[in-house]
UniProtKB/Swiss-Prot annotation:
NCBIfam families: ATP_synt_epsi. GO terms for cellular component: plasma membrane-derived thylakoid membrane; proton-transporting ATP synthase complex. This is ATP synthase epsilon chain. It is a peripheral membrane protein. It comes from Synechococcus sp. (strain CC9605). The gene is atpC. PANTHER family: ATP SYNTHASE DELTA/EPSILON CHAIN, ATP SYNTHASE EPSILON CHAIN, CHLOROPLASTIC. Its main location: membrane.
Length: 136
């Protein structure tokens, strides 16, 4: 018995296939989904979705959205997504370092739209970097 996983971004169908296990980055923490899981709807945080299929793990960087689990079908609707195997690890590392420096430079400043945007860029860069390093 397996799951059917669909990961849909606003501009593309990122993944559509079978999976033995899915780990979602929900806003309340990591959420493991196996065949027979109870139906649910959850918010997805910026992070890495992990998929186990045929004994191999694959990663997908997600940039926030929603996931629905119903009758062994997992549908993930996100703002942006990228397969870990298609991410340039060196470029992801550079983007992460730049975002870290930007956020560190704003330390101690009051909250502002610029500071929130910098924090979001850091979270997205971290997700892309993690997905690139855990890709099989």
């Amino acid at each position: 018995m397996s799951l059917t996983l669909r990961v849909l971004a606003t501009d593309q169908n990122v993944f559509d296939g079978s999976a033995d296990e899915v780990i979602l980055p929900s806003t309340t923490g990591q959420l493991g989904i196996l065949p027979g899981h109870i139906s649910l709807l959850t918010a997805i945080d910026i992070g890495v979705l992990r998929v186990r299929a045929n004994g191999a793990w694959n990663s997908i960087a997600l940039m926030g959205g929603f996931a629905e689990v119903d009758a062994d079908e997992v549908t993930v609707l996100v703002n942006k997504a990228e397969l870990g195997s298609s991410i340039d690890a060196a470029a992801a590392e550079t983007a992460f370092q730049k975002a870290t420096i930007m956020v560190a430079g704003m330390e101690g400043q009051p909250s502002s739209p610029e500071k929130l945007k910098a924090q979001q860029q850091l979270n997205e860069a971290r997700a892309r970097l993690q997905a690139s390093k855990t890709a099989d």
